[in-house]
Amino acid sequence: MKFFLKVSACLCLALLIVTSVFSTTNNDKAFAEDHSYDGKSPYYNSCDQSAVTKEKKWIDSNSYVELKFSTTCKTAWAKVTVTRAAVYNNEADARIVRKTDGKAYTCGSAGGNGVVNKGQTSCYTPMVYDLDPRKAQAQGKHAIPNSDAYNYAETIWY
């Protein structure tokens, strides 16, 4: 009988230890913010109407990227502009990145208007919510003619 009680006690203790190990929460998980403006077009709720350019950075002599910020919606997005009509498809693209959680969108994401293709001059990304203490950065790329490479530029974090 004593042996049975000792075995039962050991099994209960082992079960308790295993249960407590697997039931602890992991606080190291990445935290992705979720805001109603994230992934929406800058034209959503007329956010574009209060847009200011926080920085404009030249990618090369024919293109630049802008970090746009809506003072009303408190959102940011990226816009890339080619100073002449694109001569081929996928010539330029922009990306917006939020620093706090790494959320990022390109012109090709839903809510953007697609990459700069032949005959076009610009594209914009969807928005990320960017109220302080959040910060966002615009990144742009423009194809180098006759190669598979791109020139890149990035703005300040704002």
For the regions a protein language model found, what residue spans apply to each?
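C-terminal segment of classical bacterial N-terminal signal peptides
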Residues: 15-28
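Post-signal peptide N-terminal regions of Sec-secreted extracellular proteins
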Residues: 28-158
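N-terminal non-cleavable signal-anchor helices
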Residues: 8, 19-22, 53, 129
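Bacterial N-terminal signal peptides that target proteins for export
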Residues: 1-11
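Compositionally biased, low-structure terminal segments
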Residues: 4-5, 23, 32, 151
